[in-house]
Amino acid sequence: MSDQSEYKISKDDEHSIYASEINKEKLQNTASPDVDYGDTASLKIDPKVEKKLLLKMDLVISPIIGFLYLMAFLDRSNIGNAAVAGMTEALSLYGERLNVAVSIFYVLYILVETPSVVLVKRIKASRMLAFISFAWSMTVLFSGFMSSYGGLIATRLILGLLEGCLFPALNLYLTTHYTRKEQCQRLSYLFASAGLAGAFGGLFAYALEQVHAGNKEGWQWIYIVEGLVSFIGVPLCLFALPDKMENAWFLTREEREVAIIRRDINARYHGEQHFEWSEVRKAFKDPKVYVSATSQFCADMVLYGFSSFLPVIIKGLGFVGLQTNYMTIPVYIAGVISFLFVAWLSDRTQLRAVYLISASTVVAVGYIIMLASDSNAAKYTATYIIAIGCYIGPGLNLGWLNNNVAGHYKRATAIGIQQTLANSSGIVAGQIYRSKNAPKYILGNAFTLGCVIVGGLAYVVMFFSLRYVNKKRDERCARGEFDPSAIGDFADDFRYYL
């Protein structure tokens, strides 16, 4: 599907867009100054060298961004573990106070996503991520010293403000250094980190709950220790995460040359390197951004709700305490493995919609079982069915948007818009999955099932809309009709991923 998923180009454009040669002057102007590239008049990409380059990028970049997102996910979700470990009594979290504290995290979280992601390129990703990591680690650390409900609300707001800048920045970073056909697999590593946090976060918290030292209770040590561990991300970002692959410390001279050629090949995808408000406005006016945001909202509802009712169902099977945590592990692992495989397959086939629609169908079946059955065994089986598709939806849909928005600042804005609207589902989930509705959570599960159906329909709308545009562009190109004023993903030679 190469023609259907990349730019179609004219012969005159071949050198500037998809050439395998790059001139010496460009290399010397953009590459690391400590490398002498010699005669590079006819450089070509060696597949073996590119394979080594990608492997090295994966081995360095993926663990760093995976660690950041894993800790961020732990730090935002540890409120539930802390509440069980004694924070409820210590801070008087009675009535709906805990639900409010959970939901209020997303108020500033969703407000900062769009403006922060636009700033990534101007600030440099390594510096921005290091600052975010430092600030949120400090916030989590000092959460261990809270003494009132007001203090909890304040720390949740600050944490939301900081973590709202994180995920869009990580996602945009991946789109900067990986090609369109490589992105979903790498994005799956981020969601795998979230799954691992869900699988083992409870065990980690359980171990910390047993600590009673320094006049601190177990719930306080959860915050203190997790905050300290999060600090590891600061030096990793500052000293190990490259802003430009042509200057990456872990690449050889030959691999840096290939990195430069890859960047040149994808020049039109990355678009204008200087900030322009017109690119921001294009994102706000693009209908596909809002269709994507709608389906992302629906997919995120599954994620946020899933983590709420899973422990309750397992407790209903007769398991208690540490046993409950053990029983959640295989469910989360099933979700992680499923998404890693589907993301790899999606990049391999360069298809998106077919996997998203299939995942929605699977998740819907799981929720129907959850609502229709009174058997805890059947409900536990349903959690596996839901887990198989719950990461595919938000992960692959975000990757689909990444693929189909060209121009760095337009794409950055589109990511911010999508994530802002989608993460408002966190506020909703905190209100429809209430403890008084346990263990059936009929309201929450029924609402989420409705979201799954709406999200699936949004995927269908997106697929047929993009296929129609691709077909029309094929026809115009066949007639030799090109609109020279159309740029980015609106250009006649741009083909959307389907």
Curated annotation (Swiss-Prot):
Task: State the UniProt keywords alphabetically.
Answer: Membrane, Transmembrane, Transmembrane helix, Transport
| Cellular localization per UniProt | Membrane
Segments passing through the bilayer: 54-74, 100-120, 128-148, 150-170, 188-208, 221-241, 302-322, 326-346, 353-373, 381-401, 446-466
Q: Name one GO molecular function term.
A: transmembrane transporter activity
CDD domains assigned: MFS_FEN2_like (cd17327)
Q: Which InterPro entries match?
A: MFS, MFS_dom, MFS_trans_sf
Query: Which family, according to the similarity comment?
Result: Belongs to the major facilitator superfamily. Allantoate permease family.
Name of the protein in question: Uncharacterized transporter C11D3.18C
Name the species this protein comes from: Schizosaccharomyces pombe (strain 972 / ATCC 24843) (Fission yeast)
Lineage runs: Eukaryota, Fungi, Dikarya, Ascomycota, Taphrinomycotina
